[in-house]
């Protein structure tokens, strides 16, 4: 079987397409994040509407908002902690994979 060596133009086209694909992937993720954020805002307003009743005092409404804010801040803190734990696990796995790769490369070189 004969394999043809890719021309310089083919390589450039491959790189261009690969970069475009990555850019599109980043844009898609960005738009998905914006969609999620706006859906959360709509849900927040719905929740707030459920709590606020006609004739409530400004202080009562401010109390509800303060309580909701506190709940959301607690969730953010929990997510920050969870993210740190996941990042630590990912780093540990990366180190193990690197060591395994070095051992594998060392065995291949000695053969």
From Swiss-Prot:
Q: What InterPro entries does the annotation carry?
A: DUF496 (IPR007458), UPF0265 (IPR053375)
This protein's GO CC annotations: cytosol
State the compartments where it is located. Answer: Cytoplasm
- Please indicate if the UniProt record lists Coiled coil as a keyword: yes
- Alphabetized UniProt keyword annotations: Coiled coil, Cytoplasm
According to the UniProt entry, the coiled-coil residues are: 14-41
Which residues form each disulfide bond in the chain? none
Q: Which family does it belong to?
A: Belongs to the pole-localizer TmaR family.
UniProt function note = Pole-localizer protein involved in the regulation of several cellular processes.
Per its UniProt record, what HAMAP family does this chain match?
Answer: Pole_loc_TmaR
> This protein is called what?
Pole-localizer protein TmaR
- Origin organism is Escherichia fergusonii
Gene that this sequence comes from: tmaR
